[in-house]
Amino acid sequence: MTEVKLDHPGGQLSMPVNTAIEGPAGIGVSQLLKQTGMTTYDPGFVNTAACSSGITYIDGDAGILRYRGYPIEQLAEKSSFLEVSYLLTYGELPTQPQLTEFTERIRRHSLLHEEMRRFFDGFPRDAHPMAVLSSAVSAISTFYQDSLDPFDDEHVEMSTVRLMAKVPTIASYAYKKSIGQPLLYPENSLGYVENFLRMTFGVPAEPYEVDPVMARVLDMLFILHADHEQNCSTSTVRLVGSSNANLFASVSAGVNALFGPLHGGANQAVLEMLETIRADGGDVRSFVRRVKDRQAGAKLMGFGHRVYKNYDPRATIVKKAAQDVLGRMSNSDPMLDLAMELEEIALADDFFVSRRLYPNVDFYTGLIYKAMGFPTKMFTVLFALGRLPGWIAQWREMIKDPETKIGRPRQVYTGAAQRDYVNLEQR
């Protein structure tokens, strides 16, 4: 086994290197504290691998994203969201009978318990759909208390199917609640994405015809968001799951992590930026100059990524989808033109190129969601719907991993040294 040696004040420590199929290897530091009395210090876990995983591979420098070895470009073009969900969950692409069975199982469990309607009634009308989604995901576990054991394979299978089936229903209910419209039951003759669109935008008074182009584009966007290695929300799902919390509780925690604007709110921020540019007369070059001069309020949103130091491979796919979707609209959205002009100017400017600031997946997704009719507060919910199979797959992998331990990071203490208590009257 390859080792690296660390010289420290007390001597030298040999540490094993965990090799990777692709990408960086990991230095095993499990004996570091015991042998040296010191810990690693890595705010944000930028250089820390908390697990080994066989699900998603990213090469940020080369702009590569693969699910279970399959390039994201191929999956987005040729696959479907439920097929990709199967791939992430079980490790291989399904045969036709396997995919049919998987789809049918999900379809049969799309209905929510009737008592959940009273649960939704407890939220104020202006409740953010992400808060409702997180609460409801946790709450539905109370209806299945006999099948929550994370170490029972049958329980895990049922929890997997129930989450995949019911989260779109919850998401549509959260939206309907916010606009004061009645909740629609699922229509199981429809496909997964078509059913979600109907529950979200349909009304009982008239039939709702799902636009097949919009359904396919949303299905593709779900694929692009399905997993992304050990990001904030996925790491949260794993961390909570490491305590042996059930799948519902762990995914609910992941939803809350995604709710944070630094993680799930970027596409909304892009729209707000484009609105600002348009309100100021549509002068993109002037806006870019203000960004470079670091003027107050001028921030380039939708560019750059924590991992990708090249063009986000998902962004290329989303850009084409945005052009297709918005090109079908009777009135073209001027913000698409602004976005494309901004991208062109930024990619030709050494200021941004030298800083490796390239468009990410969020740069165009907000425009597509807006064109479909979703309000901005639903954007992060759509992100969560896409990320759901990734959270499930990562949780299942973590539960089966013999190296899994309850997550318990260390700290470098910087508080007060020991001091004696002073009675209140003497202070």
Segments (PLM) and residue ranges:
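Non-transmembrane, aqueous-exposed alpha-helical and coiled segments at domain scale
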Residues: M1-R427
